[in-house]
Amino acid sequence: MGKVILGIETSCDETAVSLVEDGRKVLISLLSSQVDLHRLYGGVVPEIASRRHLELIFPLLDEAFRKFPREKIAAVAVTYGPGLVGALLVGLSVAKSLSYALNVPLIGVNHMEGHIFANFLEDANPVFPALVLVVSGGHTDLIFMRGFGDYELLGETIDDAAGECFDKVGRVLNLPYPAGPVIDRLSKKGKPIYKFPVARLKEEGYNFSFSGLKTAVRVFREKNPEAKVEDIAASFQEALVRALVENTEKALKECMPAKLYLAGGVAANSRLREEFLNLGKTYNVPVHFPSLQYCTDNAAMIAAAGYHRYLSGKYAPLNLNAYPSLMLGEERY
């Protein structure tokens, strides 16, 4: 057996535990979602999320250890940022305790790096340099990746993240939280007949802006209450995907990567996946995105990223802290 890494993820509203061998073979992947709990409030409530993580993490670990001998674990990898500080501290405290008790290295993993590494759980042929678009509820980042752990941030959102925009538009349309999957489904029943604006920033670069799009949908809805929700959803989704794809295409032409990757919760969007495949065909660049189960927060991606840090000897001290605003590529130990 190769090196088995225990991954722990508690950065937001998903409590997850996973055991992954050699960064690729998922032996166990357990997850308990808090979506139903936070749906009552239309979004994640940090205090509730932290308390729920405390209730869920130990049963998940017990289940994992019933299926796999803990003495065969080579290291414990845990998300230490970015995310909700209280939620992060739950996973971090448990990971430190396990590292000490099992006498194995502790490895701190950046949550965004975890999303990127979700691709490498399944991609048998990672190629670099690569262009990576990470789209989630809290981030919209376009990244040039020269190799494992070598990142250059090309562009990011200057206001709302793409996933955040989905949820805010969902509230305008009276859709349940999280709105992203609902809008995706509704869009397949509607037509993108309304032309919502796509922000084109004046400065050079690859930054994104979605606040104007969100406002445009709200104003349109107020002025056109009779418009079909399915058509509004399809039109909004088309505009948002267009914004993501246009910047990615611009970077693709200028950076000439060997491969194109998509990551993060919004990577599950069917229209975005379709357009990324079209980009790959147009520019003859291979495209990879995670299977749906690894797009949203999970611990397998944390274990995968942790494995590569383990190979590099990047072990964290037991006084490792949580960093809610941790940047990709930023090292805090």
Swiss-Prot record:
<feature type="binding site">
    <location>
        <position position="180"/>
    </location>
    <ligand>
        <name>substrate</name>
    </ligand>
</feature>
<keyword id="KW-0479">Metal-binding</keyword>
<comment type="similarity">
    <text>Belongs to the KAE1 / TsaD family.</text>
</comment>
<feature type="binding site">
    <location>
        <position position="184"/>
    </location>
    <ligand>
        <name>substrate</name>
    </ligand>
</feature>
<dbReference type="InterPro" id="IPR022450">
    <property type="entry name" value="TsaD"/>
</dbReference>
<dbReference type="GO" id="GO:0005506">
    <property type="term" value="F:iron ion binding"/>
</dbReference>
<keyword id="KW-0408">Iron</keyword>
<dbReference type="Pfam" id="PF00814">
    <property type="entry name" value="TsaD"/>
</dbReference>
<dbReference type="InterPro" id="IPR043129">
    <property type="entry name" value="ATPase_NBD"/>
</dbReference>
<dbReference type="InterPro" id="IPR000905">
    <property type="entry name" value="Gcp-like_dom"/>
</dbReference>
<keyword id="KW-0963">Cytoplasm</keyword>
<feature type="binding site">
    <location>
        <begin position="134"/>
        <end position="138"/>
    </location>
    <ligand>
        <name>substrate</name>
    </ligand>
</feature>
<dbReference type="InterPro" id="IPR017861">
    <property type="entry name" value="KAE1/TsaD"/>
</dbReference>
<feature type="binding site">
    <location>
        <position position="269"/>
    </location>
    <ligand>
        <name>substrate</name>
    </ligand>
</feature>
<feature type="binding site">
    <location>
        <position position="167"/>
    </location>
    <ligand>
        <name>substrate</name>
    </ligand>
</feature>
<comment type="function">
    <text>Required for the formation of a threonylcarbamoyl group on adenosine at position 37 (t(6)A37) in tRNAs that read codons beginning with adenine. Is involved in the transfer of the threonylcarbamoyl moiety of threonylcarbamoyl-AMP (TC-AMP) to the N6 group of A37, together with TsaE and TsaB. TsaD likely plays a direct catalytic role in this reaction.</text>
</comment>
<keyword id="KW-0819">tRNA processing</keyword>
<feature type="binding site">
    <location>
        <position position="115"/>
    </location>
    <ligand>
        <name>Fe cation</name>
    </ligand>
</feature>
<dbReference type="InterPro" id="IPR017860">
    <property type="entry name" value="Peptidase_M22_CS"/>
</dbReference>
<feature type="binding site">
    <location>
        <position position="111"/>
    </location>
    <ligand>
        <name>Fe cation</name>
    </ligand>
</feature>
<feature type="binding site">
    <location>
        <position position="297"/>
    </location>
    <ligand>
        <name>Fe cation</name>
    </ligand>
</feature>
<dbReference type="GO" id="GO:0061711">
    <property type="term" value="F:N(6)-L-threonylcarbamoyladenine synthase activity"/>
</dbReference>
<keyword id="KW-0012">Acyltransferase</keyword>
<protein>
    <recommendedName>
        <fullName>tRNA N6-adenosine threonylcarbamoyltransferase</fullName>
        <ecNumber>2.3.1.234</ecNumber>
    </recommendedName>
</protein>
<dbReference type="GO" id="GO:0002949">
    <property type="term" value="P:tRNA threonylcarbamoyladenosine modification"/>
</dbReference>
<dbReference type="GO" id="GO:0005737">
    <property type="term" value="C:cytoplasm"/>
</dbReference>
<keyword id="KW-0808">Transferase</keyword>
